Amino acid sequence: MKRKTKVTMNDIARAAGVSQATVSLVLNQSRNIKLSDDTRQRVINVATELGYDRLPAVHAPRNQEEIALLVSSMQSFDPFIDAISQAREAAWRNETLLTVYDYGDDIELALNIIRQLEKRNCIGIVLASPVTTLVDMTAFQDCTRIPLVLLNQRDPGSPLLPSFIPDDYANAFQVTKHLIACGATRIAHITGESWMEASRQRLAGYQAALQQAGLACDDDLVRQTNWQFSESFTATTSLLELAERPDAIFCASDWLAIGCYQALAVNGVRIPQDMLLAGYDDQKISEQLTPPLTSIQLPYSELGRLAVEYLCNQEDAATHVTLAGRLKVRASSLV
């Protein structure tokens, strides 16, 4: 007898003509992202027609165990959406409902949500950020007896609070080492705002790889931006104006890399013949650029799954999981 093929969210997305992120948001019953009622209903109808067996009830049973995922902000195009998708899948595998709340970086709202969760059969809370960062959990101390873990953020002052984050240091080291292996000796780095833990760790990983290879860490080759295309364009232009140009550029995000592509094109610099280029976080658009962009795929899917499984298994030991991503080598860094 032929085994029935499992219906995935990718299958639903293709049939409904929407993204997997949209399917995830609809099936999670998230109301904090502006989706039309028609889109929501189309996704539910397609999921039903395909035989998707994990459709949540509109009203969960009173005794249904749930895990709440509170995220400081959520944008459907962000790779972090993969963490939410896999967290939901892990919850369902453990016969638990995952509910998602976007608290808009409003601590008072987050605390109010947690107080409401105390009245329900909530077995765990995942406090998440779409941006890898350090967080001060002082405001959340003693606010609940519900087990709580951090996803994509950590609090150095709370060593007993479990956290699950990507290893930005190791990832940046991996990208820079790849560019060096491809023959680059003057590698520039276009990064984000210095207050962000992600920016600091990526810069540190980049510098460590240079030092290991015996290459100088030249401050003139580092450009700080606020993550905007226009600033990346300006930063790249200024690098090209140096007396000794870089032969490779490592951008701390794929969005920064887009501004870099534009500046290089305007100045007649070819990728990769004249300049090797690599990005970070493996946005969907990275494969569509010309040439396709080498980037780091962040392990958000696994981190989201591990955070939920930790709560479902009711583990007591403090856990701090840091996972490296996967280098996706494409034509932008290959001569």
Predicted regions and their residues:
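Hinge/beta->alpha junction and helix N-cap segments in small-molecule ligand-binding domains
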Residues: 71-82, 100-109, 163-174, 190-235, ...
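Short beta-strand segments enriched in small/hydrophobic residues
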Residues: 22-25, 60-75, 178, 186-192
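Short acidic capping loops at alpha-helix termini that bridge into adjacent secondary structure
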Residues: 186, 217-221, 271-276
